Structure formats: structure tokens, C-alpha cells
Amino acid sequence: MAPGEKIKAKIKKNLPVKGPQAPTIKELMRWYCLNTNTHGCRRIVVSPGRLRRLLWIAFTLTAVGLIFWQCALLVFSFYTVSVSIKVHFQKLDFPAVTICNINPYKYSVVRDLLADLEQETRGALKSLYGFSEVKSRKQRDTESWSPAWEGVRPKFLNLVPLLIFNRDEKGKARDFLSLGRKRKISGNIIHKASNVVQVHESKKVVGFQLCPNDSSDCATYTFSSGINAIQEWYKLHYMNIMAQVPLEKKINMSYSAEELLVTCFFDGMSCDARNFTLFHHPMYGNCYTFNNRENETILSTSMGGSEYGLQVILYINEEEYNPFLVSATGAKVLIHRQDEYPFIEDVGTEIETAMSTSIGMHLTESFKLSEPYSQCTEDGSDVPIKNIYNAAYSLQICLYSCFQTKMVEKCGCAQYSQPLPPAANYCNYQQHPNWMYCYYQLYQAFVQEELGCQSVCKQSCSFKEWALTTSLAQWPSAVSEKWLLPVLTWDQGQQINKKLNKTDWAKLLIFYKDLNQRSIMESPANSIEMLLSNFGGQLGLWMSCSVVCVIEIIEVFFIDSLSIVTRRQWQKAKEWWARRKAAPSAEAPSGAQGQENPALEIDDDLPTFTSALSLPPAPGAQVPGTPPPRYNTLRLERTFSQQLADTRLPDEP
């Protein structure tokens, strides 16, 4: 393009064109983009470089397309006259139900293993309280306390002596093994009573003494009730004996599903023992879980009420109860999730015999936010305690796993009532003679939160709870007992060879009271979406700024500014390098300046006219070799006038 044409095009480009006065559509659009409040259109024109202009065109067209799409949806929705009807039949998943007999093992089967322990227990009762148990069952043909024990120290009472303390005589106790003589008690005396509930204190208390192996540092545990002391002492030895029995043998000694579950109905349909899964509990024997996600299916119910839940009749068999291990008759039931471990001993509900127990459920689901909103955990993976249970994480599982791990570390064996950690064995006298003392000391530290388990374990973020409402009714009634008990006996077939009474049976009904499910969900008060929305509202209110404006700010203040600073620094670096290369390498003079110049040699006297004449003459001015330019060639008035003559403005109408 000729120089004149270039100047002409530049002048046209910079002419102030106003809206409708633009000569072409292109110039009109350009004027609109330069003067509109729509930021995207303006950036299309003023952005330098083809790539940036293409990006702004893409952003603007995308935004315009979204606007048309959303507006079209709003218009169509406004003029739509159709009606939508939703019919939803709600169903709730039925929880898992675990049922256990309170008595873990049939007494007729386990009696041989516990014969010596029971004999010493009866002898201790006779010596401590001065009475003998009245035999009321022909099946229990055990030996009573006899003088043959005199002079012989029994095994169980020798390991853990039973003592009677008189509150008036501190530090002394009566041991029946010493023929009633009082002896001094060394070590700590710990009274296991509640610090909250005040009970009447009797003058005499019963307890037992635990001593570490080959040590006199003993601990004596006393109880406000002799019943608690005898049962706790019996339970310690019972766990020691059963810990040495293989699991298969213990399963055979407990109740089978056919023996415990007589009849079963769910949601109006018949069920049987095949719908229950065996779960062996160390302290409750064989337990059976209904709806335990067998075959990866979970049963659900679509109606509320007792007719649409689980109905079972349980055979308790009171005749087979261990008299010292349990003092109540009935069963225990626990409602829980399918992947949850049933802590039947802690939160189970007891079922009475000769009663119909109805349990109405109401489901509540809770969902909590994890960190940073709370200290809960999703699945326990962030808790430094290994889950020794084959179940989903819960706070209770974490606490018991922590205690069992500490038990193995401190005592060298595992406590019988909890699962075994890897490469560990249950405690027993033969291999771990010191385990009882260690267990009680460790459990006391656990209750007082000295082991650190309570500070490490976290609550689960999501869990289900069933609020239970229990009601009781006498069952069977006096008029129906005459025919109902014979029918139940006939249903049991050859398994029962005696006449049953109502205390051998219990009826259980578990159902949803209604299908209303309550959900408790936590949500953050300030989310990312809300934060961006608040920012957008403030920017739009005070600066009429949008997302396009934010992109424009990023482009100008970050990309362009950084580019300019980088360019300037690069230019300065190039100039510095050029000056360094062009500068002559001047050498420093060898002596003082002017000392070797003969023209500067002066006398010590004042200067005279003669000495001034001896100075060299000043050099003459140099004449430039290049003549000055002809300034008349720089005058552009004539050329500029000729170029403006070729530019014509449109005629006014």
C-alpha cells in the first residue's frame, strides 16, 4: 500500500463516527461495540491480537446462547397448561433384628465344665451367708458343700478369694477359707459403687481380691450387694473356662434356631429358621439375626402396624438356665443396621416370658458434615485404631477395639467378651495367670479415660437410629392357655419331653409405627456457590460488574500488566547489555594527572606574562564533516492537502 493510502486509512480509522451516521454496517457495529455497556462486545473490538478477539467472540456467543436457552425455557414453562401427577408408594427397609436367649448355653450340656466352679460357689454362699441352696430341680444333681473340703484349698477360691468386710474394721476381712478368722488385707480396696446414685450402705460388704503373680500389690474390689459380688466373681471364672472351649463345641452347646424360634411371620407371610443367620456371641451364645442382607437382599415393608412387621414366638426353656450366671429369664433383642455389629449386651432390649412384647419403631437418619465442620469420620479410615470387628465403623466399635488392643499389649491376651485381634489368644489361667488383675486395672483406667481411647475415637458422620416404643400384654391369656400351650408343645415335636408352662414362652412383635422417616442433615451455612453469589451481587450492585467483567479485569491487570512489565524489563536488560559491549575498555593512567606534562611545569613563584606565553594554544573548533539537512524537504503541507482532497464526506440529506 502506498504511503498516502496508509495515512488515509489511519485517519479514517480514527475518525469519530456516531451511530446512525456510520457509512457501513461494519462501522455501525464497531461503534456499538465501543460504546455499549455489554463488556464482551467491547472486548471483541479493543482486544489486541487475533487469538484474544476469537476467545472473546466465543465467550460472548456462548453467553448469548445460554441467555436465549434459559429465556425460551421460561417462556415455554409460562405458557404450558399441562399438569403432572406423581404417585409414590413409600417403602422402608426393614432393619436387621438379632435375638438371643439370655442364658447362653444349655445347663444340662455345660454343667460338666462348670461343676467345680458351681460347687465352690455353693460352698462360698454357705460360708459367707450361712445358708444352703434349696434344690427345686431334679435335673441338678450337684454336690452340696461337705466337710470334705476342710483342709483343702479349692482352686477357684484360692485364685480369687471371696471376702466379707466390716465397715467398722478397716483393713480387715473375713475369709471363709480361714475358717471364719479375720485377716489383714493389703493393697488397695476399691468399692465398685455408683458415684451418682446414693444407696443405703450396709455394715458389711462382699468382695474379692486380685493379686498379680508373685507380688503382694493386691487390689480388693468390694460391692454394695452380695449378689453383684458373687455374680462378678463367678463371671470371671466362667470366662476363663469358656475361653478354652473350641467355637464349634460352644455352638453345639447353645440353642439351635429350631429350638429358639417356634413360629415366624413377616409382613403377613410365613417364615422359619432358614430366614435367620447364626451369630455366636461370647456371653449370649447362639444368637440369630433376621434380615441380615442374606443373598444381598434387604427386606422392606410398605405398611405400618403390627400386622406388617416381624412376629416370632420364642421358646425360652427356663429349666436349662444357669443359676449363677444369669438371674433373669427371657430373651434379648437388638434392632440395628445390616452392616452393624450387634452389641446385644450394651443396648439390647429384654423380652419377658409369659408376655407379648410389641416394639414400635420410628426411623431417624442423621447425616453430619465431616471436617472442618465437625470431628466425625466417614468410615473410620482416619482413626488410628484398627477395627477388629467384621462390621462397619461406629464409635462403640472403635472404643472396644482400642481397649482390646491395649489389653493385648498390657496383659498379653485378649478379653473373652470381645473379638480376637490378629495373632492373639483369649486369656486363661494356664497361659496367663495374671490376666484378671491386669484386666481390672486396665478396665478401671479405660472407664476413667486414662487410656486415650475416648480422645482418639470419633463419632460416625452418618448413622441410623430406631426410636423404640415398647408395650406389654399378658400372653397367653388364662382362657387361651389351655389350648395354646399344647399346640406349641406339639409344634416343637420330639424336642420337648415335658409339660410346658407359660414362663417357657415369649412372644415378640417388631414393626414400624408409620412409614414417616425423619432425616437430620447438616449443610454448610456458607458454601462456594453462596460465596460466589454474594460476590456477584456486590460487584453487580456497586460496579455493574459481571463474570465478563471479572475476566476482563484478569486480562488487563494480570496478563497485560505482567506482559508490559516483562517487556520493559527485557528491554532494559538488552540496553544494559548493549552499553556494556559498546563501552571502551579504558586503562587507568600510570601516574598522577599532569605531572609529566611539560606545559604544566610552573615555578614556585607567581605566574608572569612570560610563563603564560609559553602555554600551548587552544585547539580550534572542528568543522562537522556532514552538512545539515535541507529543512524544506520536511514540509508536508502540500502533500497532506492533496491527500485530504481525495477524501470525500457523504452529502448531508
From Swiss-Prot:
Catalytic activity: Na(+)(in) = Na(+)(out)
Post-translational modification, as annotated: Phosphorylated on serine and threonine residues. Aldosterone and insulin increase the basal level of phosphorylation.
Site (Cleavage): R140, D141, K184, I185
UniProt-annotated location(s): Apical cell membrane
Activity regulation comment: Originally identified and characterized by its inhibition by the diuretic drug amiloride.
Annotated stretches, region: Gating release of inhibition by proteolysis (GRIP): 137-225
Entry keyword NAD: no
Regions of this protein lying in the Extracellular compartment: 77-538
Summary of the function given for this chain in its UniProt record: This is one of the three pore-forming subunits of the heterotrimeric epithelial sodium channel (ENaC), a critical regulator of sodium balance and fluid homeostasis. ENaC operates in epithelial tissues, where it mediates the electrodiffusion of sodium ions from extracellular fluid through the apical membrane of cells, with water following osmotically. It plays a key role in maintaining sodium homeostasis through electrogenic sodium reabsorption in the kidneys. Additionally, ENaC is essential for airway surface liquid homeostasis, which is crucial for proper mucus clearance.
Name of this chain's protein: Epithelial sodium channel subunit gamma
